Amino acid sequence: MLVLSRKVNESIKINSNIEVLILEIKKDTVKIAIKAPENIKIFRSEIYEFIIEENKKSILKDKHNIGKIKSLFNHYFKNEN
């Protein structure tokens, strides 16, 4: 992990296409701006964790639903013969 100190209006570059600019420092809060290409997704960590958890729940539901659908197909095709 790289640890840097920056002052207001100073920035860091990540590769050549991402810049993190320090806009404001107040007590225990730092306001930053991130300039990055549109195809780079940027999330606050708590939002990212929420998205991951929701995706996991969705996958579990899908697995359950696929099992139900498979069972219905098997039942249907057994009755066809």
Swiss-Prot record:
InterPro entries: CsrA, CsrA_sf. Transmembrane segments: none annotated. GO terms for cellular component: cytosol. Keywords: Bacterial flagellum biogenesis, Cytoplasm, Repressor, RNA-binding, Translation regulation. Pfam families: CsrA (PF02599). It is found in: Cytoplasm. One of its GO terms (biological process) is regulation of bacterial-type flagellum assembly. It comes from the Bacteria. One of its GO terms (molecular function) is mRNA 5'-UTR binding. SUPFAM superfamilies: CsrA-like. Belongs to the CsrA/RsmA family. Homodimer; the beta-strands of each monomer intercalate to form a hydrophobic core, while the alpha-helices form wings that extend away from the core. A translational regulator that binds mRNA to regulate translation initiation and/or mRNA stability. Usually binds in the 5'-UTR at or near the Shine-Dalgarno sequence preventing ribosome-binding, thus repressing translation. Its main target seems to be the major flagellin gene, while its function is anatagonized by FliW. This is Translational regulator CsrA. The gene is csrA.
